[in-house]
Amino acid sequence: MLHYPAELWYNKTVIESKLLKASNILKNAGCTSVYLFGSQAKGNARSDSDIDLGVFGLVPSLFFKTHFLLENELDMKVDLVDFDHEKSFFEMLNQIGELKKIG
């Protein structure tokens, strides 16, 4: 369960619903693991914040289609990172404790 300060712009339930939807979309696209990072993971997101997601197992030919689907279904900007190709970025985020596994 993610925890957010009360003064943040969004409703915690709405964000958690979007994260569940994102995880389901990504799992249906073949992802084996889905991670949240960035301001949403740290709990300091603002009204203009996006959702930063990293995945393992997404077939490269589905990357852009899946990214497009995420942004349309969530109705917000999504940064999607393929951790299969960005392993050093994954390791750095993991080392500093900024990853939250959501799927």
Which functions belong to the PLM regions below?
Residues 54-56:
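Short hydrophobic/aromatic beta-strand micro-patches
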Residues 49-51:
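Periplasmic OmpA-like peptidoglycan-binding domain that tethers envelope proteins to the cell wall
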Residues 1-33, 41-47, 58-103:
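Catalytic core of pol beta-like nucleotidyltransferases
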